[in-house]
């Protein structure tokens, strides 16, 4: 059974999330949190969540701020004015506490892809005692040419403002990924299924670009998630699959 709920983010917007609960089961195997990647939203994981739900898991899929319907001032690809990492971590922990109040004595796991995997890395360093394991897919090892990219973003911020959408950068990044798989379209890197590629291309909740501030936050999150400090703070007993 699927239902949608919201909570108030520390970034002062409403975060939407879906809960998938087995209808007929004696005991829930675990609660599984899904953290989506860039240019995604909670609805993209409906098929996977239903599959896991049928296997006896409770699945929680949440929009990240700036994605889906969890927007600040209706702005896609924008996380907020402040240094957002601490706020995003508090949001993740708040959602876990909501579920822990409902499912006590139940294992908790996280699964994430891309930026979602980086978020889980960071979360594990801060709240690793609160869950049993994590599965990280497509977690990049860092940010290449970070200083140069940050310099370019500061230039755009000065000239256009922090909410300016970098459409050309988004298109270039997607085409670069697609060319690795001999794809001809921006979303060809996702799958060779043309119907799914067209769906992503025509969906305004996935086919959007990030703001200058959004890209800056993404780079900072990825860099910090791969820092020595984060690795040292992550519990060694936490089950991790990469």
Language model: regions and residue ranges:
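Alpha/beta-hydrolase-fold enzymes
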Residues: 122-205
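Conserved alpha/beta-hydrolase
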Residues: 44-75
């Amino acid at each position: 059974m699927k239902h949608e709920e919201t909570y108030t983010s520390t970034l002062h917007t409403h975060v939407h999330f879906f809960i998938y609960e087995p209808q007929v089961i004696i005991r829930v195997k675990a609660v599984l949190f899904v953290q989506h990647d860039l240019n995604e939203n909670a609805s993209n994981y409906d098929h996977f969540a239903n599959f896991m739900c049928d296997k006896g898991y409770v699945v929680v899929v949440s929009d990240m701020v700036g994605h889906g319907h969890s927007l600040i001032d209706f702005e896609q690809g924008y996380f907020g004015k402040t240094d957002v990492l601490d706020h995003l971590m508090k949001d993740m922990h708040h959602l876990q506490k909501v579920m822990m109040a409902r499912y006590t004595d139940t294992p908790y796991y996280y699964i994430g892809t891309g930026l979602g995997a980086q978020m889980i890395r960071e979360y594990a360093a801060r709240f690793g005692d609160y869950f049993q394991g994590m599965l990280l897919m497509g977690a990049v090892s860092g940010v290449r040419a970070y200083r140069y990219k940050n310099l370019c973003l500061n230039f755009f911020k000065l000239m256009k403002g922090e909410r300016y959408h970098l459409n050309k950068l988004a298109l270039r990044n997607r085409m670069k990924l697609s060319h690795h798989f001999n794809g001809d379209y921006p979303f060809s890197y996702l799958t060779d299924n043309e119907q799914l590629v067209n769906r992503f291309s025509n969906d305004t909740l996935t086919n959007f670009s990030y703001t200058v501030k959004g890209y800056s936050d993404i780079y900072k999150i990825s860099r910090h998630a791969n820092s020595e400090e984060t690795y040292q703070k992550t519990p060694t007993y936490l089950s991790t699959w990469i």
